[in-house]
């Protein structure tokens, strides 16, 4: 989950990372009041989850509260690379002597953590990597040893930060590592990390990505969710603890187990080439507990997707046997009633497959078609979607 800058800074404050005073708002009037309360020049900063805000006019210096009001009026509603500014951060402006770059991230390719540090801050780090690679330090971080003050100082030194700021920078770098670990982040980035004329080291910007797979350890992170930008179907699925991702096709997919669902997406996409190019509409893994309630919740989400024309239920019975899955489907259709109005193709295999198929045959629901194989089911679901 990507955070807005103001949310990242909330985590920074929580862990003692020095930053600048500021508050978030969604009105120009509040921006003026906040600026007056701060009593110093401020920065008005668009809160969008995309880079290039400054170049797009989303970051402005305001010397007075009236300037803050004017800039806030112009920035609120500003479109930055397709992201509409709905909130702004009003933060105290700081005098800057130098700008640096620091980040911690998950290096998936090398299966480790990585610290990146550069004396060339304030510009796109991709540009630094391309034009001045020798100025960007990439330092692997041992997950067990972590980052102590000595190692943090080494990171700053390898990033070519001036000798006179190494100790102060090390303190901030270690605290940023604390944010990374304690909050289960996959990215913590500060650009710029600044040195003031008074030799303070401050995080004047912040980017944090949280690992949603660790969300169970952080119920407090729920407040960071950007509800306005989240697909309502994905929100509904999350409320029911369903592993759901919306796609752009016409065939709804329900399966048990991520691997099976991924395979089903491929098979449906391939079958769709013979039926007008229809594609999978979603990824939905109901896991091992395919109860009536879980199946009903899954079908409810998929059937409320206007793009879905048919549904392919592909289940391999294991711990949860096929007869339990079949009963779940029958009961789910009863629960949904008239809301179940799109054809379902069901393929069962594995534990108690014969019993499961018998249950569905005897139920004789007009929307349900049985398939013997995954290929057959995918083809039938694609055919039904293309015909609607």
Swiss-Prot record:
Pathway connected to this protein: Carbohydrate metabolism; tricarboxylic acid cycle; succinate from succinyl-CoA (ligase route): step 1/1
GO biological process: succinyl-CoA metabolic process; tricarboxylic acid cycle
Keywords of this entry: ATP-binding, Ligase, Magnesium, Metal-binding, Nucleotide-binding, Tricarboxylic acid cycle
PROSITE patterns, per database record: ATP_GRASP (PS50975), SUCCINYL_COA_LIG_3 (PS01217)
Cofactor(s) recorded in Swiss-Prot or TrEMBL: Mg(2+)
GO annotation, cellular component aspect: cytosol; succinate-CoA ligase complex
Residue ranges crossing the lipid bilayer per the database entry: none
Broad class of enzyme this protein falls into: ligase
Residues noted as binding Mg(2+) in the record, renumbered to the chain: 191, 205
Molecular function in Gene Ontology: ATP binding; magnesium ion binding; succinate-CoA ligase (ADP-forming) activity; succinate-CoA ligase (GDP-forming) activity
Domain ATP-grasp: 9-236
InterPro entries per UniProt: ATP-grasp (IPR011761), ATP-grasp_succ-CoA_synth-type (IPR013650), ATP_grasp_subdomain_1 (IPR013815), Succ-CoA_synthase_bsu_CS (IPR017866), SUCC_ACL_C (IPR005811), Succ_CoA_ligase-like_bsu (IPR005809), Succinyl-CoA_synth-like (IPR016102)
Domain of life: Bacteria
Record Pfam families: ATP-grasp_2, Ligase_CoA
The keyword Nucleotide-binding is assigned to this record: yes
Catalyses which reaction(s): succinate + ATP + CoA = succinyl-CoA + ADP + phosphate; GTP + succinate + CoA = succinyl-CoA + GDP + phosphate
Enzyme Commission number(s) of this protein: 6.2.1.5
Subunit structure, interactors included: Heterotetramer of two alpha and two beta subunits.
Family designation: Belongs to the succinate/malate CoA ligase beta subunit family.
Function: Succinyl-CoA synthetase functions in the citric acid cycle (TCA), coupling the hydrolysis of succinyl-CoA to the synthesis of either ATP or GTP and thus represents the only step of substrate-level phosphorylation in the TCA. The beta subunit provides nucleotide specificity of the enzyme and binds the substrate succinate, while the binding sites for coenzyme A and phosphate are found in the alpha subunit.
Annotated protein name in UniProt: Succinate--CoA ligase [ADP-forming] subunit beta
